[in-house]
């Protein structure tokens, strides 16, 4: 970690922003935190925040399809690594209801032993009903599932215990549950990380616009407000006429996506001063 931070910091003077990629948790949390402290340009770990923004946008539109209310939703996130923790923190910041984090050992609860720093931090602000148990227990009565974990962990029977479930199975190349299986279990909206299924949830929709907007106004950091504004702008690109259970996000190839996200980020930066 020390060498990585030192090297990036030394070359940072030559660049307008730093996009971190493929740094595993928990190292990524410390690397990003320390770089933000020593660099005067935006530092953005795409695997964390890019993924979180596009998931938030997808959830906003899945809510429009299902009629669910943000503050009343129970959202289960499986995979408490870089992406999962960032998704949980952003959704909590946006006002989504009860976020329940799960890892290989099941539901994460405040006071659990063996948590890394990122998991420990989110344990204090998630799982407000102090649930315990396995992933199947967490999904009972849940409104949404967000998977950033491993293939084939979720069954149709587990989905059937959800409430008009929103299922984002984003493990690649094989998702936590295949879309047809999730729908067989009664899922109302299904998304994956793959382009060969409807509703691809991919951070490629986010990071080009994030940096374009930040660089345009010479922002020194990517704030929580910018991330939220980007998620809302991305969601708003899908009109009421276009919106359906199989179309909750614009195509990653839509040329308007980057400019829309950039405009939202720049506007938020100006308003924040």
Segments predicted by a language model, with ranges:
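Glycine/serine-rich phosphate-binding loop and adjoining beta1-alpha1 elements at the start
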Residues: 1-73, 262
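Electropositive phosphate-/nucleotide-binding environments in soluble metabolic enzymes
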Residues: 1-5, 25-29, 49, 53, ...
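General beta-strand structural signal in soluble alpha/beta enzymes
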Residues: 19-22, 43-46, 77, 101, ...
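Short, ordered loop/turn segments at secondary-structure junctions
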Residues: 22-25, 46-49, 104-107, 150-151, ...
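Glycine-rich phosphate/diphosphate-binding loop of Rossmann-like nucleotide-binding domains
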Residues: 45, 49, 53-146, 150
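Adenosine-phosphate binding glycine-rich loop
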Residues: 46-47, 66, 171-272
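Rossmann-like adenosine-cofactor binding region
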Residues: 121-188, 194-196
């Amino acid at each position: 970690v020390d060498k990585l931070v030192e090297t990036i910091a030394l070359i940072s003077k030559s660049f307008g922003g730093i996009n971190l990629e493929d740094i595993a948790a928990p190292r990524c949390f410390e690397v990003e935190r320390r770089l933000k402290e020593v660099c005067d340009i935006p530092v953005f770990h795409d695997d964390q925040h890019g993924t979180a923004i596009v998931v938030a946008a997808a959830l906003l539109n899945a809510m429009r399809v299902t009629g669910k209310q943000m503050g009343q939703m129970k959202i289960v996130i499986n995979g408490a690594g870089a992406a999962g923790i960032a998704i949980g923190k952003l959704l909590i910041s946006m006002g989504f209801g009860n976020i329940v984090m799960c890892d290989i050992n099941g539901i994460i609860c405040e006071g659990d032993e063996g948590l890394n720093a990122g998991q420990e931090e989110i344990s204090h602000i998630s799982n407000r009903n102090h649930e315990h148990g396995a992933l199947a227990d967490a999904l009972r009565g849940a409104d949404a599932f967000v998977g950033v974990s491993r293939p084939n962990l979720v069954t149709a029977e587990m989905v059937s215990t959800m409430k008009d479930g929103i299922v984002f199975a984003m493990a690649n190349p094989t998702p936590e549950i295949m879309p047809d299986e999730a729908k067989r279990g009664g899922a109302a909206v299904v998304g994956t990380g793959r382009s060969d299924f409807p509703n691809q949830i991919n951070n490629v929709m986010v990071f080009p616009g994030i940096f374009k907007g930040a660089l345009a106004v010479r922002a020194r950091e990517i704030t929580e407000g910018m991330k939220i504004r980007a998620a809302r702008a991305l969601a708003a690109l899908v009109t009421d006429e276009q919106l359906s259970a199989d179309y909750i996000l614009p195509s990653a190839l839509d040329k308007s996506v980057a400019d829309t996200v950039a405009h939202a980020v720049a506007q938020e930066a100006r308003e924040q001063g």
